[in-house]
């Protein structure tokens, strides 16, 4: 090879190397250090859009910041200068406790939605504490019309049949702070010796915290609360660290200086006062169990002890989202509904339609209850009615990628509770579409003819989460492509615990040293205002029976033949099914219309619940949660029976403001506008695996609303997600099978927003 040829080959090699380097640089980005930008999928993270239909009012939208501000200004002007900011109010003050949406009457709402009548006036409901009046009381005021209020109307007597006693009011944060100040500054120093010995106590040291219980006493008029004391474990659940001290605080007096400790419980024994406990300790008559303060580490921390691993699977929308959120209205190709959050009652949806037809006017959470047992006073007494604390008030921001899918749509909530100005809870709701990884229906045939047909189960989910003290509740409403609605909740968070002593194992399991996980039940109550084919509905119960039958072709033999039993229920008493008792396996609300096959168009209510036994009716507090007697009850819908519970029931359960059992008075339910009231719950006996906290697995209950002859066939037969092919067809062809197109479509990467968390409220 001559020199010229060598130089030519060398030049070609250099050019080739240069070209390859250019290709590599282009592939890594212009600066050679970063990869080229990927092709992002359209609409990676859908956002909430403003309401753009001026012809229709958003009847069910929660109040905006502007509306809340307008109501507060109006009330401040009308009620005078004696109003105190609820965040600073003492029991003897007047203050505005809460402001939220006053729901419109159903008739007026439907007239607007269906017949384009003018919308009903938009109004707010305010709860006002009048502690400074000669006869302290709680008053409910309706304020309107919004956004520029000009009137307020006292509806207390109209709604409750009389004035609301002051002792029924929920406890303000200021009241809790004053109780803590009393306990830590005035009372605990009287037992400094025994508390230092057991619990490393130092006055002002801050190593102990209190936890409330409820109800607050033993009879109407009481306001005496047992408070348990726990180690203050920063960054972890202090609920698992009881020190064995519980105090009964009487805080009924309007002057906090007059509050007293009525009784003391310490590690298995009762004392009249902390001073008596200290005296007995100094005399050597108290056997003290030393409770170690193990700090922030250990199995009770939610911080993982291992480094992050590979990223979990991620669902995204390769061709963009298939639903939208405008204001408080969610719309998909199949479903539409409006959503909101009651400050006390929790999540709710309205005007629920499938393929344009209304199925329900309202589906809403009403109340959640946890009933505890134990051998300490706080544990044995506790019946938490979470509507008093507030399932909206204590809603939490949803953490992207944990509480909801990373690419869900997140929606804020504005509220005015115990403050003079509205606040915003960021990411209070999420809405997302989810591939459940399960066929909605399918069939593979190898007999007679060969084919496959099916449709993937893709659901639309509306979610919020409430944290009530130690427990977190995940509230879901799930919309299926066959017209079914699933309503459920999951419990997670920390268990409540008590000091372990004596016969403690009768009331749960030991979960750590000196700690009992206390047995309890969870129950939630829902209002389901179904409008099946209109407002006039009937209730049908169907089940099965085996009937002795002579064999027609062999009369000397007999078989037990299975057949359907059907009964129309005529009265509210007939349609009230006690918890734990017999109930029909098929119960549905039906219209006077029939489907193609002559059957009444109906929607079935199917419960999925493992509720514990209800509170015995001879219990003095049972009437406050009398809805817990029933797994399901159907009543006539009445504007005077808007809710099965009340924010005031917790602090006076002996004379409840709302007693659900009164709703069931044997009125006819044939051809009426009906409401189904559904209870779902479960028994929880805490165990070692509840440490550090309870998992959602196996701790979810609820109910389904399922079409029952409502359609002529399964409506998902026309789903665009359906797949069908026969043996002679090429299942790998796009023209035959849309799933076969996925590998051929241009690849895209999800456009992920930055991680977000709505933050924390500082109390």
Swiss-Prot record:
Binding-site residues, Ca(2+) 2: 572, 641, 663, 665, 667
Residue positions the entry lists as glycosylated: 137, 232, 294, 618, 666
Family annotation (PROSITE patterns): COPPER_AMINE_OXID_1, COPPER_AMINE_OXID_2
Any one GO cellular component localisation term in the record: plasma membrane
GO biological process terms held by the UniProt record: amine metabolic process; cell adhesion
Keyword Cell membrane attached: yes
Disulfide bonds: 198-199, 404-430, 734-741
Entry cofactors: Cu(2+); Ca(2+); L-topaquinone
UniProt KW Cell wall biogenesis/degradation keyword: no
Amino-acid positions noted as binding Cu(2+) in the UniProt annotation, renumbered to this chain: 520, 522, 684
Family stated for the protein in its record: Belongs to the copper/topaquinone oxidase family.
Name of the protein this chain belongs to: Amine oxidase [copper-containing] 3
């Amino acid at each position: 090879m001559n020199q010229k040829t060598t130089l030519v080959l060398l030049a070609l090699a250099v050019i080739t190397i240069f070209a390859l380097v250019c290709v590599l640089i282009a592939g890594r980005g212009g600066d050679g250090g970063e990869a080229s930008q990927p092709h992002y999928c359209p609409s990676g993270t859908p956002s909430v859009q403003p309401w753009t239909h001026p012809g229709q009012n958003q009847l069910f939208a929660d109040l905006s910041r502007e509306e809340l501000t307008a109501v507060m200004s109006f009330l401040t002007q009308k009620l005078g200068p004696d109003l105190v900011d609820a965040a600073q109010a003492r029991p003897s003050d007047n203050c505005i406790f809460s402001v939220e949406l006053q729901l419109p009457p159903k008739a007026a709402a439907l007239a607007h939605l269906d017949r384009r009548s003018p919308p009903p006036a938009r109004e707010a409901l305010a709860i006002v504490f009048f502690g400074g009046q000669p006869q302290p009381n709680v008053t409910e005021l309706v304020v309107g019309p919004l956004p520029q209020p000009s009137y307020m109307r006292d509806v207390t007597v109209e709604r409750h049949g009389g004035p609301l006693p002051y002792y029924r009011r929920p406890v303000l944060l200021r009241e809790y702070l004053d109780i803590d100040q009393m306990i830590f500054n005035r009372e605990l120093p009287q037992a400094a010796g025994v508390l230092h010995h057991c619990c490393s106590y130092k006055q002002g040291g801050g190593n102990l915290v209190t936890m409330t219980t409820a109800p607050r006493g033993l009879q109407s008029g009481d306001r005496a609360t047992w408070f348990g004391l726990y180690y203050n474990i920063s960054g972890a659940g202090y609920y698992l660290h009881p020190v064995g001290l519980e105090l009964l605080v009487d805080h009924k007096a309007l002057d906090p200086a007059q509050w007293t400790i009525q009784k003391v419980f310490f590690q298995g024994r009762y004392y009249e006062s902390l001073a008596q406990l200290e005296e007995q300790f100094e005399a050597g008559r108290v056997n003290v169990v030393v409770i170690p303060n193990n700090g922030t580490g250990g199995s009770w921390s939610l911080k993982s002890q291992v480094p992050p691993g590979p990223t979990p699977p991620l669902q995204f929308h390769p061709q963009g989202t298939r639903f939208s959120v405008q204001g408080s209205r969610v719309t998909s190709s199949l479903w539409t509904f409006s959503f909101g959050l009651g400050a006390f009652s929790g999540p709710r949806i309205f005007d629920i339609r499938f393929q344009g037809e209304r199925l329900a006017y309202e589906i809403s959470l009403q109340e959640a209850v946890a009933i505890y047992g134990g051998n300490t006073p706080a544990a044995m007494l506790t019946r938490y009615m979470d509507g008093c604390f507030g399932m909206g008030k204590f809603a939490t921001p949803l953490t992207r990628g944990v509480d909801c899918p990373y690419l869900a749509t997140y929606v804020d909530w504005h509220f005015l509770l115990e403050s003079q100005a509205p606040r915003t809870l960021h990411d209070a709701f999420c809405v997302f579409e989810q591939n459940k990884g399960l066929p909605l229906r399918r069939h593979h045939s190898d007999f007679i003819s060969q084919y496959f047909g099916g449709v993937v189960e893709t659901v639309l989910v509306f979610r919020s989460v409430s944290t009530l003290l130690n427990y977190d509740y995940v509230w879901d409403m799930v919309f299926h492509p066959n017209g079914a609605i699933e309503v459920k909740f999951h419990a997670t968070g920390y268990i409540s615990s008590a000091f372990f002593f004596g016969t403690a194992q009768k009331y749960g399991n030991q979960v750590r040293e000196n700690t009992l996980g206390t047995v309890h039940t969870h129950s939630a109550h829902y209002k389901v205002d179904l409008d099946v084919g209109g407002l006039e509905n009937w209730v049908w119960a169907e089940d099965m029976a085996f009937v002795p039958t002579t064999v027609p072709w062999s009369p000397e033999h007999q078989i037990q033949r299975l057949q359907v039993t059907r009964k129309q229920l005529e009265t509210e008493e007939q349609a009230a099914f006690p918890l734990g008792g017999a109930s029909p396996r098929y119960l549905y609300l039906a219209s006077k219309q029939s489907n193609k096959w002559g059957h009444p168009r109906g929607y079935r209510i199917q419960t999925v619940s493992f509720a514990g036994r209800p509170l015995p009716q001879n219990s003095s507090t049972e009437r406050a949660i009398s809805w817990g007697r029933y797994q399901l009850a159907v009543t006539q819908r009445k504007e005077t029976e808007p809710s099965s519970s009340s924010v005031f029931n917790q602090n006076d359960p002996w004379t409840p403001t709302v007693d659900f059992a009164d709703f069931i008075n044997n009125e006819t339910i044939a051809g009426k506008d009906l409401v189904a009231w559904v209870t779902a719950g479960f028994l929880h006996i805490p165990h070692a695996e509840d440490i550090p906290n309870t998992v959602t697995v196996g701790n979810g209950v609820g109910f389904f609303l399922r079409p029952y002859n409502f359609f002529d066939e399964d409506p998902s037969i026309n789903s665009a997600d359906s797949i069908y092919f026969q043996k002679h067809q090429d299942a790998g062809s796009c023209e035959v099978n849309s799933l076969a197109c996925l590998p051929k479509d241009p690849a895209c990467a999800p456009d992920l927003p930055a991680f977000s968390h709505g933050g924390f409220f500082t109390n």
